[in-house]
């Protein structure tokens, strides 16, 4: 007769599983996740893990990032940063800024996985930005090791005089739209964790038509679809056991299209045609007929423009308001109905189109013509009226699933910032906000004085925007320095280099002046000497290295050899 007892291996396996589930539940009860909502259980997470547990350096950086941002939030200040292009920039930034940003735009234009540059359409391989994160994170780790070796080789007096640089500044990376469905987002987030990202942001545009936040033609996905992306990202972080900071971005302020009308929270912002003459003349059908007749290019565009100009596009709410105003009623009764409509459909209530029609019927405006389907684009997208209100609705929906909310804007508008912050804080008072100090804005045309520009960051920080960043700061800084130096080098030769680069490095204490030392030649000399018993005749920084010229001493110059040597000073802060 077969034994009914359970083999010890099975009970041990079950015990390990239950213990891990309990550990995850305890982890989720910590203050770090007090505001986080998950539609899945700890059992789901543990079921997706393997038996070999990993630890990730990025998790330490994520915890550091969380502490940094919460500290700024409490103080009413902001972590300010910009997009870093390379190890030089990331090490220079570390001396002055407490976070690092990795921009998808910069990667798209300067460093894709295929080396094929282009605009920010998120059409590069999905490992492009994770690769850049690893590039910068490895540089951070290396310069941290290099500094550590240098400091432990100093006397206490020397260390006291040598500023310590925290090279391990947390990196927040651009996750674009998640690069596809839920499984694509999961795999992307796994890469980010493995490559060193402390935080990741994901936006609510369609992954098929993704654009830079400051381009036209942006298409949103439904609120529910973007929530699925955020949940997929959080699930992957949970499976890996990390506290990666998740930033949810919305492009709802400037978006003009949306993929579908499936989510009722989007209904109030979708546009429909109100011209009853167009009842059986959808835009898509009109354009298809024109194309079948051989119309192309500018002619086809003119047909579309004419249709749109005569269709009477507006939201359902505006159509109802117009309908009430056309009613043959005393003015006081019209106003009463308008007030009732406004109160019943206040934007934060997210009234669906079906609910709105019921209210309109009650107010005598149920017979209005309004059709959101006939106005759809040839691609099938619905027309969308972007606004701060739309961004608030989306931000509120995303907040339980994200750590920060970022509203992409088209200009640096303090009123707009205040409106968004107030809308978010009304329902999520502890949520952290992010702001793109975009170089796509013409800041000089924004109507601000120099003083107002200087105070812009601290002013919106007090509103709750505790992480602020210039997405393409590294790109523009690199372009400016290279262009101006190249121009002057072409005219003045080495004088341009000495005046614009070498002397400025010296005057500002930039450690790349001694680039051999910056690159770690001393550090690897330590390796060589350690391997060879303390001495090495092939040490890179040994006798004969030209970097000795940069020590604080006078030396004989080489200018005017026909007139004899000229003494020049070559001082540096080594």
Curated annotation (Swiss-Prot):
Entry's EC annotation: 4.1.3.1
Pathway named in the protein's UniProt entry: Carbohydrate metabolism; glyoxylate cycle; (S)-malate from isocitrate: step 1/2
Start and end residues of each stretch annotated as Disordered: 549-574
NCBIfam families to which the protein is assigned, alphabetical: isocit_lyase
Keyword Ribosomal protein attributed: no
Biased composition (Basic and acidic residues): 549-562
Location in or out of the cell: Glyoxysome
Active-site residues annotated for this sequence: 212
Summary of the function given for this chain in its UniProt record: Involved in storage lipid mobilization during the growth of higher plant seedling.
Motif segment (Microbody targeting signal): 572-574
Known partners and oligomeric status: Homotetramer.
Catalytic activity: D-threo-isocitrate = glyoxylate + succinate
Binding of Mg(2+), residues: 174
Binding positions (substrate): 103-105, 213-214, 249, 436-440, 471
GO BP of this protein: glyoxylate cycle; tricarboxylic acid cycle
The entry's keywords: Glyoxylate bypass, Glyoxysome, Lyase, Magnesium, Metal-binding, Peroxisome, Tricarboxylic acid cycle
Family: Belongs to the isocitrate lyase/PEP mutase superfamily. Isocitrate lyase family.
Name this polypeptide is given: Isocitrate lyase
Gene3D superfamilies associated with the record: 1.10.10.850, Phosphoenolpyruvate-binding domains
Gene: ICL
Gene Ontology MF terms: isocitrate lyase activity; metal ion binding
This protein's record includes keyword Transmembrane helix: no
One GO CC term, this protein: glyoxysome
Primary enzyme class: lyase
UniProt-listed Pfam families: ICL
Coiled coil: none
Cofactor: Mg(2+)
């Amino acid at each position: 007769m077969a034994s009914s007892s359970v083999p010890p291996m099975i009970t041990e396996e079950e015990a390990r599983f239950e213990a891990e589930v309990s550990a995850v539940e305890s982890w989720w009860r910590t203050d770090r996740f007090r505001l986080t909502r998950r539609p899945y259980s700890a059992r789901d997470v543990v079921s997706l893990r393997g038996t070999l547990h990993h630890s990730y350096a990025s998790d330490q950086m994520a915890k550091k990032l969380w502490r940094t941002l919460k500290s700024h939030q409490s103080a009413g200040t902001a972590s300010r940063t910009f997009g870093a292009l390379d190890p030089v920039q990331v090490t220079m930034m570390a001396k002055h800024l407490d976070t690092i940003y990795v921009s998808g735009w910069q990667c798209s234009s300067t460093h894709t996985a295929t080396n094929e540059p282009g605009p920010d359409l998120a059409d590069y391989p999905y490992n492009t930005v994770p690769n850049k994160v690893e590039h910068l994170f490895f540089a951070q780790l290396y310069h941290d090791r290099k500094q550590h070796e240098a400091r432990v080789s100093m006397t206490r007096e020397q260390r006291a005089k040598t500023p310590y640089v925290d090279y391990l500044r947390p990196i927040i990376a651009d996750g674009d739209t998640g690069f596809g469905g839920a499984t694509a987002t999961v795999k992307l987030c796994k890469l980010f964790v493995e490559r060193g990202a402390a935080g990741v942001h994901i936006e609510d545009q369609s992954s098929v038509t993704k654009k830079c936040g400051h381009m036209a033609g942006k298409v949103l996905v439904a609120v529910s679809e973007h929530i699925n992306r955020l949940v997929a990202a959080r699930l992957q972080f949970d499976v890996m056991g990390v506290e990666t900071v998740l930033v949810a971005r919305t492009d709802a302020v400037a978006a003009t299209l949306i993929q579908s009308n499936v989510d009722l929270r989007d209904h109030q912002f979708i546009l429909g045609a109100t011209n009853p003459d167009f009842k059986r003349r959808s835009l898509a059908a009109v354009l298809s007929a024109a194309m079948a007749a051989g119309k192309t290019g500018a002619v086809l565009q003119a047909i579309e423009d004419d249709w749109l100009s005569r269709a009477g596009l507006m939201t359902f709410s505006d159509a109802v308001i117009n309908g009430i105003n056309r009613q043959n009623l005393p003015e006081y009764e019209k106003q009463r109905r308008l007030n009732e409509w406004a109160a019943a459909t206040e934007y934060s209530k997210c009234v669906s189109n079906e609910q709105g029609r019921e209210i309109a019927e009650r107010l005598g405006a149920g017979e209005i013509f309004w059709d959101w389907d006939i106005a759809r684009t040839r691609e099938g997208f619905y027309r969308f009226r972007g606004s701060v209100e739309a961004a608030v609705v989306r931000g509120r929906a995303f907040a339980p699933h994200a750590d920060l909310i970022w509203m992409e804007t088209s200009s640096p508008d303090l009123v707009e910032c205040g409106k968004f912050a107030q809308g978010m804080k009304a329902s999520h008072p502890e949520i952290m906000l992010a702001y793109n100090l975009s170089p796509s804005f013409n800041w000089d045309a924004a109507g601000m004085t120099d003083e107002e520009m200087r105070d812009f960051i601290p002013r919106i920080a007090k509103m709750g925007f505790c992480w602020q960043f210039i997405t393409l700061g590294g790109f523009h800084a690199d372009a400016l320095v290279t262009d101006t130096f190249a121009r002057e080098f072409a005219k003045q030769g080495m004088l341009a280099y000495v005046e614009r680069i070498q002397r400025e490095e010296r005057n500002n204490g930039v450690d790349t002046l001694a680039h051999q030392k910056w690159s770690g030649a001393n550090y690897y000399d330590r390796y060589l000497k350690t391997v060879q018993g303390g001495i090495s005749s092939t040490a890179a920084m040994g006798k004969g290295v030209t970097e000795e010229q940069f020590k604080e001493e006078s030396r004989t110059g080489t200018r005017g050899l026909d007139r004899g040597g000229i003494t020049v000073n070559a001082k540096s802060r080594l």
